[in-house]
Amino acid sequence: MLRASFAGSPYVGVFARATDDVLLLRSDVDDDTADAMAAELDIPAVATTIGGSGTVGALATGNENGILVTSNVTMREKEAIETTASVSVTELPGRINAAGNVILANDYGAYVHPDLSTEAVESIESALNVPVARGKLADVRTVGTAAVATNRGVLCHPKAREPELEAIEDHLDVRADIGTVNYGAPLVGSGIVAGQTGYVVGEDTTGPELTRIEDTLGYLESITSE
């Protein structure tokens, strides 16, 4: 576990995104933070913009099969990511294309913004090679901000309803539970960068919140199994 911030903001999930084999970070991150995050997540880091923006966590997501980014990405940015990642980078089509905000995914499935077009859903299915379902989470359409997923669990907005949790469990094939980050903030996807072996959380996150995060996302299980 690593507590961190970007330019004083504890919403680390807005500015960084971890897939199975690469950590994407905003381009102006300091070297110490980049190195610490890469070490915690045990994956190489790429400091970059996406579409000229530093909000790379909001604009990108991925799993073991591929990475999805906003269609505003430049060729130079795509090449920078693909140089380090072992998978291809695909642009999410349509007007709702902040991939990190609108897609919640792991290696088993994806749960996405309810208004994504059929073309966008098909693009996600192809890029990530998983089944896709549309839905909301606690009335939040940007489901990637309202939850964070690993291959062991999904931590969701504290006002998520039971049918929503069940839908996420069905489509991502892991247990889902509720929690908060950064001393009570409900948009947990904006405050956590979750990898398969470790995670980075906003610096304002409390001890009880950390316990819920580690239990729900499977880090306690991982430690026990070791």
From Swiss-Prot:
Keywords: Initiation factor, Protein biosynthesis. GO terms for molecular function: ribosome binding; translation initiation factor activity. One of its GO terms (biological process) is cytosolic ribosome assembly. It comes from the Archaea. The keyword Protein biosynthesis applies. SMART domains: eIF6. The keyword Transcription regulation does not apply. PANTHER family: TRANSLATION INITIATION FACTOR 6. Binds to the 50S ribosomal subunit and prevents its association with the 30S ribosomal subunit to form the 70S initiation complex. Belongs to the eIF-6 family. This is Translation initiation factor 6. It comes from Haloquadratum walsbyi (strain DSM 16790 / HBSQ001). The gene is eif6.
